[in-house]
Amino acid sequence: LLIRKATKKDSGAIVSLFNIIIDEMDLDVIKSLDRSKLDIVFQKSFETQEFLTDWAQTTVAVENDKVVGFLYGYSFENEKRINKLMHSFLKDAGLSPSIVIFSDPEAFPNEWYLNSIAVDPEYQGHGIGSKLLETATIVAAKQNKNKLGLNVDWENPRAEALYYSYGFRNVGLIILGDHNYNHLQKNVKK
């Protein structure tokens, strides 16, 4: 298994994994849109240096030349401009620029926020998610953050238990769409 920084060429595979999370979020705005057009928005986003390395950091797990997992996150202070950049691709994809996909703030101040982490279902249970979580801790430290944060859906207690086993603790509640999430944080050594 190879864990490496994502490149533009990985964007299609990343979008497939990102959609696992999007489906679980069950957002009304997503349900109302043409998903193939929305995939264009996501793909264009994950092709930019801003999403890959500059404002956010995207990492992939690769097995036999296939992207089987990814993580994507950013420092709290970059959240608004990342969302704005993603929204700038709506028109290119044939969607109304007035659509707001992600309106709720997700990150907490002074943290590196793990927005997304997903592993291909065929590859789950082999420690790939754990390796990606370890990588997120390293990325947070490199971004000079002493906290790594993430949101976990109340409907996913298995994931929450996994995060607790990695030293995360519940620091708050956040509502995204119609779902309640616990906001978890872990201290990171710089």
Where are these regions (language model features)?
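Conserved acyl-donor/pantetheine-binding loop and adjacent beta-alpha core of acyl/acetyltransferases
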Residues: 77-112
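Conserved acetyl-CoA-binding loop-helix of GNAT-fold acetyltransferases
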Residues: 125-139, 161-165
